Amino acid sequence: MVVDGKTTRLRASCNACNESKVRCSQRKPTCARCERNGVECIYGLSRRTHKDAPPISMPPSQRSHNHPRGASRSSSSGGDTKANSNSSSNWHMSPNVPFMIPPQQQQQQQKDEAAAAAAATPRFQCMYTPQDATADTVNRAGLLLDMDFSSLVTGSSSPLTSVDPLSAAVTRFPTPGAEHTNPWALGPFFGGNTNNNSINNPDWTRQPTTMGPMITVPTTAPPSPSPSCTECSCHAGVTELLSSMRGGGDDRRLSLDAQLAKLKRCIVSSETSMGCAHGRDDAEPIHILAVSTLIGYVIDEFEMLASESPLRLSSSLADMSGSRNAERVAESILSSGSDESMSMSSMAATTGVNNMSMSMSMGNLLEPRLSWGVLELEDDDEVDLRQRLYLLSFRKLERLLSQLTIYLRNLHDARAGLPEPSRHMAFVMACDYTRLWLEKKAEDVKRMFLVARPAGDETMDPALMFTAH
């Protein structure tokens, strides 16, 4: 539009739609919204083209102070003011200056702005109470900088905490803090503490409207596990032993007494884990898989003992017989011969005895001797007693496998009574097949112990004999 030879550009949207932050139909001279609401439609000057154009919410008393003092600027602004003198006699001011609008039009404007704010936020419904038209102008303008979000939830209409529709529409989505941007800090969704969520974050408590999908915000934390579940330590022994057996190679260099003590500890820890009663009745006892793995390690250790026990015993007997022969040779040399030959022979015999004693001490470090108080056991008796000791320890493993069988049978019966039992039978069948494999492997290892027993021992204890399952 050209006024007095100068091009004047107006805003794309009218002042009323621009104030309410809604889309304007841009129809001249009256847009659809202003025509529907029965208000005056005014298109102000464009701020991009006319830098000296006053803002929409600026009172007329402040416009004269913002005009530049110059001949060129004054002539241009004078032409612009003259061009809009007929249509801008009554500017549509923002809610921050209520005395510029008649009371009837101001009430209609507040209703329009509240409806526009609700239309701009279809998913959330802010509890807003329109404020009094006679409120203090300073307090109303200060709300834009210091707004209390609690009024959005409680719906209070006090002059100090009320919010105008424009501020409610612009600030309806708060900036999330670190507790909301971190996916692992979502307490209500991961069972965390939600006592402070409703106080520190009131914006999350707004009620959803029926226009969008329903969003259910949990108001209480999920039920926490009972203290007995959090304090359960029945499976700690199995976990610790499985972690220590990953190396495998270092355990083979242990002495026999240390190996048997560790195997006994594995058996006791497995029995404790199977006897745990802290789990839920409808949950799958995953710890049984860890117990089965530990039993497999125990069977491997017994297999190693069965394959290496004759070799160890024979080497131990050879060391003991060699040391005794060296002692006899030293005694015979010392009892006969001259002084020079005696000294030479004694040095050689002493060296041989020291070497045998060193090898004997190393053998004793790996293979401790069996004794019963002051009773000295013969070599053959010690071999026989060690073999029986292996079988006695292995009998504890067989008792553990029997307990595993009873446990899985009870688990099968319990899962059969639940709704949709086929959903749990796969886990029970997997555990049962693992048990069958462990029993078969244990039978083969026990057969190795019986084959490696000392020759000529026909009076074996019937309780230690192999019985097929």
From Swiss-Prot:
The protein's matches in CDD domains, at most eight in alphabetical order, are given as: GAL4
* Compositional bias (Low complexity): 104-118
Q: Where in the cell is it found?
A: Nucleus
Q: Which cysteines are joined by disulfide bonds?
A: none
Does Transmembrane helix appear among the keywords?
no
InterPro entries attached here? Answer: OAF3 (IPR050675), Zn2-C6_fun-type_DNA-bd_sf (IPR036864), Zn2Cys6_DnaBD (IPR001138)
Polar residues composition bias: residue spans: 82-93
GO terms assigned for molecular function: DNA binding; DNA-binding transcription factor activity, RNA polymerase II-specific; zinc ion binding
Which Pfam family name is an example for this entry? Zn_clus
Q: Which GO terms describe its cellular component?
A: nucleus
Signal peptide range = none
Keyword field: DNA-binding, Metal-binding, Nucleus, Transcription, Transcription regulation, Virulence, Zinc
Q: Mind listing where the DNA-binding region sits, in residue ranges? A: 14-41
Which residue intervals make up region (Disordered)?
Answer: 49-118
The job of this chain, per UniProt, is described as:
Transcription factor; part of the gene cluster that mediates the biosynthesis of the phomopsins, a group of hexapeptide mycotoxins which infects lupins and causes lupinosis disease in livestock. May play a role in the regulation of the production of phomopsins.
Identification of the protein by name: Transcription factor phomD'
Q: Per the UniProt entry, what species is this protein from, by scientific name?
A: Diaporthe leptostromiformis
